[in-house]
């Protein structure tokens, strides 16, 4: 029944009601985003409402280089979303955002450092495989992972050649001060020296 309404009427309804979910009920309606007068971050809306099927559809449109992508995908907003999902560790969403064009290298590889800080090893590995630099910002990733006791992240970073002794064994001391014995033990086994205060 709804698909019997002319597109012009749908545009008026959406503009009046401000309900973008009306455009998400049908793939044909989705293209009406080009015509509506609503300023909204559709990617953020789709993710917040856990509409993964819609996100899949947007990714498919991106791969097809559909012109609607230019209206609904704004790189700055993608980058903001990417940081948020690196904090929460949602690898599935991180992958979608990268496919849609989020810049994993922005702000000295902030997203990989954020994932390290929060202990999301699978997100870290994915971002590194996509070209993120775990040594950016003076090897900050290992300091953040050590400080928060994320042993698996620390082990991964060391295996990738991150310099954990760069600042007079700062990482091991921070891990020790925060009570992360397993990180301390690992770094000592790799040659770090714990400095007493």
Swiss-Prot record:
Is Cell membrane one of the keywords?
no
Q: Which Pfam families has this protein been placed in? A: Ank_2 (PF12796)
Q: Which spans are transmembrane here?
A: none
| Entry-linked SMART domains | ANK
Each ANK repeat occupies one of these ranges, namely 78-106, 107-136, 138-166, 168-196
Listed InterPro entries = Ankyrin_rpt (IPR002110), Ankyrin_rpt-contain_sf (IPR036770)
Keywords noted in UniProt: ANK repeat, Repeat
| The protein, known as | Putative ankyrin repeat protein R875
Q: Which Gene3D superfamilies match?
A: Ankyrin repeat-containing domain (1.25.40.20)
Signal sequence span is: none
């Amino acid at each position: 029944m709804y698909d019997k309404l002319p597109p012009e009427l749908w545009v008026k309804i959406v503009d009046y009601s401000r309900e973008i979910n009306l455009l998400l009920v049908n793939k044909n309606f989705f293209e009406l985003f080009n015509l509506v007068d609503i300023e909204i971050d559709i990617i953020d809306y789709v993710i917040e409402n856990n509409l993964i099927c819609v996100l899949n559809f947007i990714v498919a449109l991106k791969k097809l280089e559909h012109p609607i992508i230019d209206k609904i995908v704004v790189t700055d907003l993608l980058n903001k979303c990417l940081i948020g999902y690196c904090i929460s560790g949602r690898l599935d969403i991180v992958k979608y955002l990268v496919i849609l064009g989020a810049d994993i290298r922005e702000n000295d590889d902030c997203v990989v450092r954020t994932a390290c800080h929060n202990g999301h090893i699978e997100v870290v590995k994915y971002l590194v495989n996509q070209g993120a630099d775990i040594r950016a910002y003076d090897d900050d990733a290992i300091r953040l992972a050590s400080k928060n006791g994320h042993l698996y992240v620390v082990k991964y970073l060391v295996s990738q050649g991150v310099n954990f002794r760069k600042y007079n064994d700062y990482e091991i001391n921070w891990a020790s001060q925060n009570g992360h014995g397993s990180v301390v033990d690992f770094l000592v086994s790799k040659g770090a020296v714990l400095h007493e205060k």
